């Protein structure tokens, strides 16, 4: 992603649009039971961004949810069509997690990891080169170094 270039995305009806003003940190596919239920699918693909780089335009509503670990998250949806746009997880301070397929160019963000594969549907086959984790991964050892450093610096600069 070039400097001064933004990524864009939207809901299905177009009432909510968003921009991401910096390169995303990491993209992952989650196979946990909660993600399966909320999406009605076998997994969801999420892209993590610094929370100050996500600019939302349009009316959204949110609801608080509990994750499988019991931690809280806040899910944000279009008020008109209900498209699930992004999540803020209590355990992911300083990051917002965008539903990757709402990005206009989502094909450019394949999963860099598959998490909670212990809950993966048995008929779903992942390629041998997929970076898979039965539960969550260690961010420092999984994310690209540049993304990890940028995230840590952001937390430090913003005293989080």
Regions found by a protein language model. Give the residues of each.
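A short Gly-Trp-Pro
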Residues: 1-10, 15-160
């Amino acid at each position: 992603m070039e400097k001064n270039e933004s990524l864009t995305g939207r809901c299905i009806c177009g009432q909510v649009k968003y921009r991401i003003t910096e390169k995303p940190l990491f993209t992952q596919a989650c196979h946990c039971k909660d993600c399966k239920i909320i999406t009605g699918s076998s997994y969801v693909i999420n892209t993590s961004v610094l929370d100050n780089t996500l600019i939302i335009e349009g009316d959204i509503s949110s609801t608080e949810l509990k994750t499988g670990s019991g931690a809280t998250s806040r899910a944000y949806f279009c008020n008109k069509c209900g498209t699930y746009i992004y999540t803020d997880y209590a355990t992911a301070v300083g990051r917002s997690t965008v539903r990757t397929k709402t990005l206009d160019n989502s094909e450019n963000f394949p999963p860099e990891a598959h998490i909670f594969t212990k809950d993966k549907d048995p008929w779903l086959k992942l390629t041998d080169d997929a970076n898979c984790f039965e539960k969550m991964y260690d961010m420092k050892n999984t994310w690209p170094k540049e993304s990890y450093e940028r995230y840590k610096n952001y937390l430090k600069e913003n005293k989080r």
